[in-house]
């Protein structure tokens, strides 16, 4: 018979340790060209982000939110009216088109729709009008700052504005802007992807991908612009608020050698473990801190619909997990994940990609390259579960 010594870890503790270590690292990134990765992703029927490969039913419902989407509809109509017939033809897609799922962060990815680069000043104003109607002032500024920082990246690469630039972003519109029928729009480019689905007065703004390399313009045309600094500091404040027992649950790995996001481009069906510290195990102040952290990301959409989404998040707070990879010093690099049945948020300090030539150690993650992903798990990214319910009720 084997006798365990007093300080020998139990099998359960060992298993928990191993499981935590495994869940700290996402599956290996898909290889191959963007075209091959797109084809492989689209070959999979859409399921959505899940914890086990099966979407949890009954989370999303057709209903009135009481928050108008009329300004978004009008702005989309004005944008489409500003385009030439040729531009409009390549911008419009059916509401259930696979174009929704055709996005990724890689700057060389061939995108559909009309680009800001080919737009006239009046057309750009109409495009930003669509973003302004759909997003909060904070969300609009973040989007425009990301575009400007892509110009900064061009400056850091010998003024290579063919691959990196402020106007290398495309807009597509799925469906016809309507007060009653489903439709939406997408902006897609380097470090900025927003999918915005509308059905009546309901809005689903996900998947969202925002980030930059660099996240601060220290010189050049847009010197002084900085993004995602509050999201960075508030995440750090959250993990620092935890006591020792909570930290053992939340921190999956104190080391961060690479990239950790699960749910970037072509990962619509990613299986993401809900590991970490549950909201049920937070005190009142920590719950408030966690909700405030979620709100930083949700508040990029227009105010009324952000409030609707936050009510949804609060309803599942006890089932919401907070997970951490990396250190918690002032200069640490880290990854954190907030995961509930109705929202997935990932914040990741990434390895340098397009500034490797400027780094002392190009294999180590840096604070100057951040990727953020916001998803609606369990089948409602792109509003797909709402669209499914609508089509069942209103067969076409």
Which role fits each region the language model picked out?
Residues 2-12:
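Bacterial N-terminal signal peptides that target proteins for export
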Residues 5, 22-23:
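Generic N-terminal simple sequence motifs
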Residues 2, 25-26:
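N-terminal acidic, proline/glycine-rich, low-complexity intrinsically disordered segments
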Residues 26-81, 90-396:
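A cross-kingdom marker for long, charged
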Residues 10-21:
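Bacterial N-terminal signal peptides
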